[in-house]
């Protein structure tokens, strides 16, 4: 047998990650195409649209789709960037190529994971977060947001999904003076999406103005439009120091959760955070998944590991997906 880096990570090489991984994550192996029939059987009975954000694996879109479909046995994928370009900046040929690749692997798109409104709020003090510009090969200032929204609507139609992910501007030390105006902008965008029968998903993001369950609930209450929903990210909330489950989740209107991102996090003694494989951090994913299932959530449950402890995005995502599937099993959910 030829021992590759991936095989070593799936076996004894995982011991080197012990400092950051729980027993669940340490058990993680890798998926192979030989296991595809069993994986597909689980996918067909899964109550969620189990997915992965494509660029968490690789910028090679063909390879990412092959891994998602054949190795992970999934039917869904979330689109953010590929070929070192944000999905919102793909040209016509690249869009056509992407659609052909998706069709070849029989993958459906959960949503367009766009960078919409991940910028500074005009007129407010410049956010400390704005220097990071972590937008996955995209950088649109405030003046470009309306045009970006139209592009996202077009992409949703192209990829036959009804959901677009957005944010609510880089986090301010004191967003209160601007909150009403920010909400108005979000509502305006949601109503534009509604005209095309699309759902606008606000992600709670630690670098933006809505990060926790409490903040998410407040925005959802302020914007009652039914097609304005939450992309609930417990890992992001935990990174800011809150307890996403059960505390944050308890505050959320369950019928307004339209997507969920899966990642895990470790809080360090200096109160900073670092990412972990799913099941290897402080998020109570067993409880969270059970609650989502109990409350009738049946939309995208998408792995966005961010963790890179296995050396490469692909290897890290394989371990984190294995952790997610083991966590689903522990939660009594067949996927």
For each of these PLM feature ranges, what is it?
Residues 97, 101-104, 147-151, 184, ...:
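A non-catalytic, amphipathic alpha-helix used as a structural packing/dimerization or gating element
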Residues 83, 87, 131-132, 169, ...:
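Vicinal oxygen chelate
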Residues 2-23, 33-37, 43-51, 58-75, ...:
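Histidine-acidic metal/acid-base catalytic patches
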Residues 106-122:
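Glycine-rich, aromatic-flanked loop segments that form ligand/cofactor-binding clefts
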Residues 13-20, 40-44, 66, 119-230, ...:
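Active-site acidic/histidine proton-transfer and metal-coordination neighborhood
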Residues 80-98, 102, 171-173:
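Glycine-rich, proline-tolerant flexible connector loops at the mouths of alpha/beta enzymes
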Residues 52-56, 79-83, 111-116, 166-168, ...:
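A cross-domain feature marking catalytic cores of carbohydrate-active enzymes
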């Amino acid at each position: 047998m030829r021992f590759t880096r991936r095989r070593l990570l799936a076996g004894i090489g995982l011991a080197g990650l012990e400092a950051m991984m729980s027993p669940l994550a340490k058990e993680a192996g890798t998926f192979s195409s030989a296991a595809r029939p069993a994986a597909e059987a689980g996918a067909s009975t899964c109550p969620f649209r189990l997915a992965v954000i494509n660029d968490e694996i690789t910028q090679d879109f063909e390879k990412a789709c092959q891994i998602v479909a054949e190795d992970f046995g999934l039917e869904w994928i979330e689109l953010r960037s590929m070929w070192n370009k944000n999905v919102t900046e793909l040209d016509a040929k690249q869009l056509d190529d992407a659609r052909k690749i998706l069709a070849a692997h029989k993958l459906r798109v959960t949503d367009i994971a766009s960078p919409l409104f991940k910028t500074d709020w005009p007129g407010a003090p410049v956010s400390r977060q704005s220097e990071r510009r972590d937008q996955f090969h995209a950088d649109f200032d405030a003046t470009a947001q309306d045009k970006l929204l139209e592009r996202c609507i077009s992409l949703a139609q192209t990829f036959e999904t009804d959901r677009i992910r957005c944010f609510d501007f880089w986090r301010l030390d004191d967003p209160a003076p601007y909150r009403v105006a920010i909400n108005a902008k979000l509502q305006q965008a949601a109503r534009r999406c509604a005209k095309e029968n699309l759902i606008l998903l606000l992600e709670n993001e630690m670098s933006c103005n809505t990060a926790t369950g409490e903040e998410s609930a407040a925005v959802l209450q302020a914007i009652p439009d039914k097609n304005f929903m939450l992309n609930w990210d417990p890992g992001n909330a935990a990174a800011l120091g809150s307890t996403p489950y059960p505390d944050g989740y308890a505050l959320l209107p369950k019928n307004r959760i339209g997507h969920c991102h899966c990642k895990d996090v470790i809080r360090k003694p200096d109160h900073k955070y670092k990412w972990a494989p799913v099941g290897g951090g402080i998020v109570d994913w067993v409880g969270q998944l059970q609650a989502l299932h109990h409350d009738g959530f049946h939309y995208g449950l998408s792995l966005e590991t961010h963790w890179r402890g296995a050396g490469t995005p692909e290897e890290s995502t394989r371990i984190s997906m294995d952790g997610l599937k083991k966590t689903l099993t522990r939660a009594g959910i067949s996927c």
